[in-house]
Amino acid sequence: MAGGIGSRFWPISRADQPKQFLDFSIQGRSFLRRTYDRMKVVIPEENILVVSLERYRDQVRAHLPELPEKNLLLEPYNRNTAPCIAFATYAILQRDPEAVTVVTPSDHAIARHDVFNKTLLEALAYASGSNALITLGVVPTRADSNFGYIQMAGKAEDGRPVKIKTFTEKPDADLAHVFVETKEFLWNSGIFVWRADAIRQALEKYAPEITNLWAGWPEALGTDGQQAFVDRIYTDMPRISIDYAVMEKTDNAWVYPAEFRWADIGNWESLYEYLAYHDERGNALNRTARRLLVDSSDNIVYSTRDDKLMAIRGLEDFIVIDTEDVLMICPRDEQKLKDFLSRLAMPEYEEYR
């Protein structure tokens, strides 16, 4: 899934170049490129599909030049994950009615790839013999209120998923701490494994407002009229996540506990943990930025330029972002930042979105 806007990472992530096409690390590969490279170790490349927006066609092609044209599915509008997954599911079913699929966001950071690959292969093997709707749940290493949590209904056993008891979307810090202490909760990774026909049946049962629009898909997908068909039905497509549309309604939701290192790089706080370099005072920095920091601590300092010095004195818990056309300086407080970024919707800032 590579169609998000990444608005919480403004001004680095913009509508015309969202975060899946950016490289926040020092590896020279975008999130999309790294996700594709990670998945092709487990999934044959001819079976990897990318769902993105029509406006990002050229960027996807630039980052993944080897991707077959038929494996690039283009939505006219972003309608969240449930419509995106429905689109991919119908396209996969047309090619292989018995397919077992993995659904993954394109903008997550994953380490310990050997553990990730083992977990994915085990989940695929289990899903192939059942109708279970499986999500990978990451064993939490800290109480983090930026992630969603999944409560297990029972004790985890090696090689088998556990029934899901509850979902909690981004609890406050105190509740997140309680969750981690109980050892009943996992981070919701947003990575899913299931048979294509199983998720189709679940979507038809719990989200008919999506699947009813897809009437006629067998005749439309894979033809010259595919894009026109998709563009037409998306004018009425609801905006809803797969968790709300299906996973929180079904009694067939399972979680596979996993211990690979994972992070949803969804906001500046998560990027603070992810950035490659932290100085002795807790400032998170990208290595290419030229900076002079004095009496400053626990800041996020990021620059897209290497020809400009960032001189900072006396700042604590701030975000300082410097790009070609925008300089942003604001406290790290997430709620204040959210309110601040919401003002970008005003017409006078349109050229900077």
Question: What are these regions, as identified by a protein language model?
Answer:
Residues 45-46, 68-69, 96-99, 129-133, ...:
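Short coil/turn connectors at secondary-structure junctions
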Residues 8-15, 26-105, 109-117, 121, ...:
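Conserved N-terminal catalytic core of the sugar/cofactor nucleotidyltransferase
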Residues 196-353:
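Left-handed beta-helix
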Residues 1-2, 51, 102-105, 135-139, ...:
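Short beta-strand segments
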Residues 113-234, 254, 331:
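Conserved core of the sugar-phosphate nucleotidyltransferase
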Residues 102, 192, 264:
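Residues that recognize and position ribonucleotide moieties
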Residues 32, 88, 107, 150, ...:
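Residue-level signal for inorganic ion chemistry
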